[in-house]
Amino acid sequence: GMTGYQETLTDPSYAGQIVVMTAPHIGNTGMNTDDEESRRIWVEGFVVRDLARRPSNFRSERPLPDVLAEQGIVGITGVDTRAITLLLREAGVMRAGVFSGEAAELDPAVQLAKVQAGPEMTGRNLTSDVSVTTTRVEPARGTRIGPLAVIDLGIKESTVRHLAQRGFDVHVLPETATWADIAAIDPVAVFYSNGPGDPAASDRHVAIL
């Protein structure tokens, strides 16, 4: 929709992907620190129909284009995003490219070759890119249930927050965690987060489970 794009951009599940928004106007509410789902933007590219360069919202801290530029995320506007969505619906996920600067002047055949040479998502493991490197704990709120071991394969901050609100002391462990690391917490349950890449590349995590 017109809002929620900040949560999408900072969702680790979209690492390595170009995201296409179907709502026509994006950027109206700007960007703020409260709605971020992780420590940075993870998408590789951002495609919108119409970009609002000047936000109008009392919670806005910075314009969307400024944050994209600061983090080196390429974006494109003035695109028929719904036509792209219809194509993706029929053909499925595919490799793509957004070219800017000098790369935008390359011959289309060269641009296509660069896209075709890019990595496919099949067999790709991106969990090590997005996971925490050290364990962190989010204390329980309300009636305490006990410790919950969360294997961070690309978890969103809102998920951690909601688990804590339901009474768990949320221990967010790196994706490299072993069974010994999990057992040391003496958890009442183990939670595997969602994340980016191909689930088939997570055999090690499945083996622990």
Q: For the regions a protein language model found, what residue spans apply to each?
A:
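RNA-binding accessory domains that recognize and position tRNA/RNA substrates
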Residues: G1-A180, A184-I185, P199
